[in-house]
């Protein structure tokens, strides 16, 4: 019987890689131990952690800190999300360092209410990158998101193109990535 974790076996046999979505700290540890190469967090992550029986009290501590840092509700939500994602990013740093930044990314997405404003997406992406060097900016593959992705690629910032619902969207972002990479010589994780 093969004792190697399932996800490590799959990665050796195919180009498939295992990312975990919206994990608790314990789930992140288990995922990494079983071959996870990255993590993604949705805008709903903080609420899921507040509601989680093992994470709720921990999350409330960060929410209290965020409330003390700003009077603006929108900014508070962003600060809270960053505070919650940072410990997860720290857990994936050894993977990131071991692979020279090829794996171990933790993606974070801003509030989807702003997904039609490329300037807000860009601002949020730069702010999110301050969390940790392994932060990957999760950006919707919409016309506004594509504008933001252009800036991220030019700045050599890893991106996670999300909300891809058709082949044409995938082709568009891949063509855009190749075009900008060719022009700038930058090839961030994608």
Locate the predicted segments by residue.
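N- or domain-start disorder-to-order transition segments that initiate the globular core
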Residues: 1-26
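Catalytic beta/alpha-barrel core
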Residues: 19-20, 134-142, 157-169
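Catalytic cores of alpha/beta
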Residues: 25-33, 147-148, 170-178
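Active-site beta->alpha loop and helix N-cap motifs at the rims of alpha/beta catalytic domains
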Residues: 45-48, 53-144, 148
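Short, well-ordered coil/turn segments that N-cap beta-strands
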Residues: 14-16, 36-37, 101-106, 131-135, ...
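An N-terminal structural lobe/cap that precedes and organizes the functional/catalytic core
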Residues: 8, 27-61
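Anion (oxyanion) recognition and catalysis
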Residues: 12, 32, 153
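Catalytic alpha/beta core domains of metabolic enzymes, predominantly
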Residues: 151, 158-190
């Amino acid at each position: 019987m093969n004792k190697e974790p399932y996800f490590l076996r799959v990665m050796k046999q195919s180009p498939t890689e295992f990312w975990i979505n919206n994990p608790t700290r314990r789930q992140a540890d288990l995922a990494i131990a079983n071959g996870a190469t990255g993590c993604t967090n949705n805008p709903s992550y903080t609420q899921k952690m507040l509601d989680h029986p093992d994470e709720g009290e921990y999350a409330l501590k960060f929410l209290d800190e965020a409330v003390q840092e700003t009077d603006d509700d929108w900014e508070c939500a962003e600060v809270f999300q960053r505070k919650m994602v940072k410990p997860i990013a720290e857990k994936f740093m050894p993977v990131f360092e071991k692979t020279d930044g090829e794996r171990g990314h933790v993606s974070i997405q801003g509030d989807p209410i702003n997904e039609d404003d490329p300037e807000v997406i860009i601002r949020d992406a730069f702010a999110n990158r301050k969390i940790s060097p392994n932060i990957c900016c999760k950006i919707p593959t919409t016309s506004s998101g594509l504008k933001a992705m252009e800036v991220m690629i030019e700045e050599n910032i890893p991106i996670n193109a999300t909300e891809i619902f058709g082949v044409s969207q995938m082709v568009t972002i891949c063509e855009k990535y190749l075009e900008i990479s060719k022009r700038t010589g930058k090839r961030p994780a994608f």
